[in-house]
Amino acid sequence: MLNPLNIEYLYLSKLFDNSLIVFNKRQLFRFFVRFFFMTAALPNDSKPKLTPAWTVIFFFTSIHLVALLAFLPQFFSWKAVGMAFLLYVITGGIGITLGFHRCISHRSFNVPKWLEYIFVICGTLACQGGVFEWVGLHRMHHKFSDTTPDPHDSNKGFWWSHIGWMMFEIPAKADIPRYTKDIQDDKFYQFCQNNLILIQVALGLILFALGGWPFVIWGIFVRLVFVFHFTWFVNSATHKFGYVSHESNDYSRNCWWVALLTFGEGWHNNHHAYQYSARHGLQWWEVDLTWMTIKFLSLLGLAKDIKLPPETAMANKA
């Protein structure tokens, strides 16, 4: 049963389905306020008392502000744009989607340890927190999806699930060690966890040597802004927009445009229904570039123990 706080979302869904629902200005205003800031609809005694994470706020604000320098002519070049796109694929596609998510968080497939460590480096360069935070919080998200303990519970609004949850010291952070016992003792993981910024600085120095400040602005700051928001859309948009193919006991949706931006992560309802699956796009038209990459690694003999959902879930697959 849907939470009563999501009634405005139901209205919008019906509107998108060509229903004859008509909103007046006040209803529209109430809808958008509650859609983006759902906690405003909670009674005062139900609102969590959270402490702002000022370091995180400063970090994300700084990244976005420096990225604006890309609009200045002296920091633009097509080579710099190309470098940003290449690093977006490496850090967002290989690092986050293939590495942190499908390989490490869910163990949907296994690769040689040296290749897994490459995934960890690439994911660390995405600057979405250390590998322990990313994996631990993601595992919590699946265990408590769209309920109060979920770090980015979509009932609290689009803004909260997109970025707001990172702006506060949420209680879930204290449980990260409990959800990452399988990787906590790995020395390489520890190195990447403890040297997140230094690894990014090292990449910045390499980029500066290759192409000066345009490469740094585009390859670090602009690239991070895109990787950030495209990843965050998986937490926010795919719990609000799209269609449901499988029962998953939460609000996860399959959202085609998020899938295009995130190498197949947008087939989120499929993923929540079969969390262990290396393949998220289960229909022939649900393009999943990450699954294609896993199949390629399998052909090379590098990806093994690949987990897939039952055949009935992929009855119409290509």
From Swiss-Prot:
Pathway participation: Lipid metabolism; polyunsaturated fatty acid biosynthesis
Any Gene Ontology CC annotation: plasma membrane-derived thylakoid membrane
Reactions this protein catalyses: a 1-octadecanoyl 2-acyl-glycerolipid + 2 reduced [2Fe-2S]-[ferredoxin] + O2 + 2 H(+) = a 1-[(9Z)-octadecenoyl]-2-acyl-glycerolipid + 2 oxidized [2Fe-2S]-[ferredoxin] + 2 H2O
Motif (Histidine box-2): 138-142
Superkingdom field: Bacteria
Motif (Histidine box-3): 271-275
Motif (Histidine box-1): 101-106
A Pfam family annotated for this UniProt entry: FA_desaturase
EC number(s) per entry: 1.14.19.28
Main EC class the enzyme belongs to: oxidoreductase
GO molecular function: oxidoreductase activity, acting on paired donors, with oxidation of a pair of donors resulting in the reduction of molecular oxygen to two molecules of water
Regions that span the bilayer: 56-76, 80-100, 117-137, 201-221
Keywords of the record: Fatty acid biosynthesis, Fatty acid metabolism, Iron, Lipid biosynthesis, Lipid metabolism, Membrane, Oxidoreductase, Thylakoid, Transmembrane, Transmembrane helix
A biological process term (GO) from this entry: unsaturated fatty acid biosynthetic process
Subcellular location: Cellular thylakoid membrane
Cofactor(s) recorded in Swiss-Prot or TrEMBL: Fe(2+)
Topology term for the membrane: Multi-pass membrane protein
PANTHER family the record matches: ACYL-COA DESATURASE (PTHR11351), DESATURASE 1, ISOFORM A-RELATED (PTHR11351:SF31)
Role: Desaturase involved in fatty acid biosynthesis. Introduces a double bond at carbon 9 of stearoyl groups (18:0) attached to the sn-1 position of the glycerol moiety of membrane glycerolipids. Does not desaturate palmitic acid (16:0), palmitoleic acid (16:1) and cis-vaccenic acid (18:1).
Domain comment, as recorded: The histidine box domains are involved in binding the catalytic metal ions.
Family: Belongs to the fatty acid desaturase type 2 family.
Protein name, entry field: sn-1 stearoyl-lipid 9-desaturase
Provenance organism: Synechocystis sp. (strain ATCC 27184 / PCC 6803 / Kazusa)
Lineage of producing organism: Bacteria, Bacillati, Cyanobacteriota, Cyanophyceae, Synechococcales
Name of the coding gene: desC
